[in-house]
Amino acid sequence: LDSWGSHEFEAARYPNPQAMLDSVHAMNGRFMISVWPKFYDTVKNYKELDNRGWMYHQAIKDDIHDWLGFRGSFYDAYSDGARKMFWRQMDENLYTKYKFGIDAWWMDASEPNVRDCTPMWYRKALSGPTALGTSTEYFNAYSIVNADAIYNGQRSVNPNQRVFLLTRSGFAGEQRYSTATWSGDIATRWEDMRAQMTAGLNYSMAGLPFWGMDQGGFCVENRYVAAQQEFDR
């Protein structure tokens, strides 16, 4: 719970990850795991990246804690060295460690979403400066450089296995890194589902072919329940 960014299975819940992966593959299944570009500031991987100047510091300076109550931040994916280190940490703790048993990567929060429900000006402050320049100029491209880290990282280790990434944010040209994008966490309302159809069409018209959505919604929306009950009566 308190080791976000360690890329390690929690031993109490997953005592034998290799056996779990092997059993999934024995049933002709495929295994995808969610990995965020996020690190609590107490974990080893954070400290390794931070020692090279590859962590964003504003969230730490502002003492921002996430919904679990811990403090952390995101790595600077615009740095080639940071991308290589990020992949190496994933490889050592997940990919090569478990005999290439991870078949796909769910790269969540790749907007980047350092903090939920945050004005754009503060999102940029939390996500920079980057190795390329200000986050005002480069913010939207985070998803593609993060995808670069995993795609080229996995190919360098095991060029014979197909790479597949599911991302929560997209950018022009990102399909070159074997990505599919879904539209993120939506409410369980019909109007939200309809809005995703429009979003998906526009996304695909930009030349990005693989897109999806939370078909059943992600979060229950209660704002209109009381009004609906009044109408029903």
Tell me what each language-model feature is.
Residues 1-233:
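Catalytic-domain carbohydrate-binding cleft regions of carbohydrate-active enzymes
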